[in-house]
Amino acid sequence: MIGLVDGNNFYVSCERVMNPKLNGKPVAVLSNNDGCCVAMSPEFKALGIARGTPYYQLKDREVPKGNLIFCSSNYELYGDISRRIIQVLRERAVEVEQYSIDEAFIWPPSVAGNREQGLGNRDWYLEYGKSVRAQVLQWVGIPCGVGFAKTKTLAKIANHIGKKLPEGVFVMPDDPTDILAKLPTDEVWGVGRRLPLKLRAERIFTAKDLRDAPDDLVRSVGGVTLLRMATELRGVPCNQDRDYSADPDSVSCSRSFGEQITTMDALMESIASFTAQAATKLRRHGMLATGCNVYAQVAVPGMFKVSPEQREPRSGGYQGCGGGWDSSFYGYTVTFPEPTDATNVMVRAIHEQIGSLFVKGAKYRKSGIVFFGLEKVGAAYQADLFAPAEKREKSKLYVAIDALNVRLGKGKVFSAAEGVGKPAWAMKRSKLSKRATTNWDELLTVR
């Protein structure tokens, strides 16, 4: 049996931990730059407001029990509370595999090291789940749902059911046919939004239909990935050994600006800041980057002409159904003399080509950086014979800087290239709650 622990309305629950006055009130957490609602309390959902509704449409709205309450995304707080939940789970389970900021798979003591074990005593798992849920609530303050099943895919379904139960825990029965028959395919973990259309064309409407479909048909519709999901719906583990904490293939950082940028200095400051943040992630993973892609987005697509090489190809979140080019994104590629994790080396190399990204008169709304060609620190690579000796040695400078920023607060020590003071382009978080668990200057006051 494998369990899935998932924080209920996680962002809102984190806000309520630090401000109990929000309990029982309609609360929503906003996206970057206070754009739209990304997390909502049950009271907020009960008003019929859809997730993703823009903030400007709701900020002056009155409801019968008082005004709506909005909070800016407090990522520092959410990340710290997530870490605390994982610590509690590691106290109770022999194996813990974090899947996202608010979800983690757990293997209870009775099955750790024996993942093929069947359901066993369902009552034991039910009581164990209640105990784990109660401990997370008491120690961290976050309400959770817990689901147990033979596979990760079934555990996700069990968790979804458990969240709706008073006890917050559900153990999948040996034969989940009745449950799967009521579950649409678009609610199955990992199916996404596009595959259900293809599945319906093959008369596969529910999770039960997907489970019972022939392997060849499933593979033809969604490849090996969908076949694994179907196999897991049959109770046969396929994704048990996936490591969600494995080394990344790339590391990135990007933000939409609070105000549009019109100067090269401001554009360079934003890119230097995002480079520093991404480099910190690199060092945390113990990785070096061989190069990076730098890009920026203008407010008016196609407002000026650039060479084809300067256009940023659609990738990741920017790629449309047909691929191709996005005329609002422009960028360039930098290859470092040798793999590095040193922020100053990266910023210097990026700065040399920033002129190719900036055009006078353009208004920029976003910038970002993606490190690629990642290698483990200590791995063998071809060094640059002409590089200064100090570049080939592992510098302790950024180890010390990272340690200081952990101890004193994020961004306390930074490079001058990032600019001094809060820039106009910084992300808007006008309704930010206190970062009381990670910032000494924002500790809560007890009266």
Q: Model-flagged regions — what are they?
A:
Residues M1-R234, Q240-R242, T280, A389-R447:
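Gly/Gly-Pro- and Ser/Thr-rich, intrinsically disordered tail segments characteristic of DNA damage-repair
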Residues S31, V63-P64, V298-V300, G378:
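Short acidic-glycine loop/turn motifs at beta-strand connectors
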Residues Y99-E103, A149-K152, M287-G291, A362-K366:
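Short Gly/Ser/Thr- and Asp/Glu-enriched loop/turn motifs at secondary-structure junctions
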Residues F105-S110, Y330-P337, K376, Y381-A387:
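Short, hydrophobic beta-strand segments
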Residues P143-G145, N293, G368:
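Residues at or immediately flanking beta-strands
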Residues V169-M172, T185, V251, F257, ...:
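Short clusters of hydrophobic/aromatic residues that line enzyme substrate/ligand-binding pockets
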Residues L195-K363, R447:
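DNA-contacting surface of Y-family translesion DNA polymerases
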Residues V345-V347, H351-R407:
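C-terminal hydrophobic structural anchor segments
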